Amino acid sequence: MVVGIEGIITKKEPTFIIVKCASGLSYGIFISLFCSAKIQTQEKHEFFITQIIKEDSNKFYGFLDKDEQKMFEMLLKVNGVGANTAMAVCSSLDVNSFYKALSLGDESVLKKVPGIGPKSAKRIIVELSDTKTKLENVSDDKSEALAALLTLGFKQEKIISVLVSAQATGTSELIKEALKKLG
């Protein structure tokens, strides 16, 4: 199983790249539009890879950060959501917007994604509505900040709503930002 690829981007399309590794091998990798906007050809990058092997294909889906990869993999667990739909969500919503929509149960955000209708949006919200699942898929810093804020007596749903939109990095910075917003 391939979990990461590092190399120079030799070809770039909006949602597909070819990366040439030091070994001389080149790999085709599907990427989100957010990822595409951050990279250029002839640049060296490292990608977190989700490999999907089917009877007739072996595809790589690449991500610059672990949170986007976790979001993609989480979407794949929803009935009726395949890799193309999951990648469309990753291309349309950043990680924070996605988790905020989940925590608020906001189907309208998901319905704006090409290929997601009312039924699919509802299914995604329902199947991924478990708060614990959402928290396992955010960074360790956010999980630690959540635990700290819970001990201070704040309500879990409010904390999650604040943390998914937080811009700070690092546990202490996240806690400070959340405390300002939670009052």
From Swiss-Prot:
Coiled-coil region(s): none
This protein's record includes keyword Calcium: no
Annotated region described as Domain I, given as residue ranges: 1-64
Protein name per the record: Holliday junction branch migration complex subunit RuvA
Domain III as annotated region, ranges: 139-183
GO process terms (BP): DNA recombination; DNA repair
Quaternary structure and interacting proteins, as annotated: Homotetramer. Forms an RuvA(8)-RuvB(12)-Holliday junction (HJ) complex. HJ DNA is sandwiched between 2 RuvA tetramers; dsDNA enters through RuvA and exits via RuvB. An RuvB hexamer assembles on each DNA strand where it exits the tetramer. Each RuvB hexamer is contacted by two RuvA subunits (via domain III) on 2 adjacent RuvB subunits; this complex drives branch migration. In the full resolvosome a probable DNA-RuvA(4)-RuvB(12)-RuvC(2) complex forms which resolves the HJ.
Key words of the record: Cytoplasm, DNA damage, DNA recombination, DNA repair, DNA-binding
Subcellular location: Cytoplasm
